[in-house]
Amino acid sequence: MNAIAKALAVGLDVRTASLVSSLVHDGKSWTVVLADGTELKADGIVVTSPVPQTLALLESGGVVLTPNDADALAAITYDPCIALMAVLDGPSGLNEAGAVDPASGPIDWIADNFLKGISAVPAVTIHATPEFSRTQWDAPDEAITEALLDAAQLESSVLPGSVQIQRWRYARPSVEHPERFLRLSDMPPFVCAGDAFGGAKVEGAALSGAAAAQAIESALGRNA
């Protein structure tokens, strides 16, 4: 999936593995402060991180939001998701489409990565429901693995040592902002975007990003 982003980023100065600790402005421009002390200057900023993380960066930089902006961002909420990935010793037994949405139980979605053509060996990805993820968030990986595999009822066994558990606290928006982006008021150009703005999933995130790009270009007096 990152192939699209890589293609769009050709020719850009892209920094990876750079943890941002705060966002600071002086009324005219922004300073992005990294955890290692590096400071990057910017005329404007677009953020697509989950809103709680964006708010934490702004708070760390001493940025005060207007009441309207604070209320709009506080209204956005997310569901968590615990994901399990595992390699099997044979076929999963899922249908030809390679994905199943169970009607009940702890599993929200199962995908056969081999049938989808993204794995050379039999392998599955299991997403737990928001409720299971919430209640079992701090449970040991072994307990989560047992519960999800029991519910999955796969035809083949999991290869020892192949299970990976991932926890996404802000996996998907449960309450979205009604517009494609939100430009913060009374500060240098700063646009919030992402899958929580005007439509979840990949399509919504892409549309939000395109709208945010136009908004920041306009705010900076450039042609989008």
Regions found by a protein language model. Name each.
Residues 16-31:
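A conserved short coil-to-beta-strand element within the FAD-binding core of flavoproteins
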Residues 39-96, 158:
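Central helical "cap/lid" subdomain
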Residues 124, 180-213:
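Short FAD-binding loop at a beta-strand-to-alpha-helix junction that anchors the flavin cofactor
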Residues 1-7, 15, 138-147:
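Short beta-strand to alpha-helix junction loop
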Residues 146, 151-188:
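Flavin (FAD/FMN) cofactor-binding core of flavoprotein oxidoreductases
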Residues 74, 215-224:
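Active-site-proximal substrate-binding core of FAD-dependent oxidoreductases
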Residues 35-37:
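Glycine-centered tight beta-turn/hairpin loop motif at sheet-sheet or coil-to-beta transitions
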Residues 85-136, 143, 147-155:
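Active-site substrate-recognition segment that forms the wall
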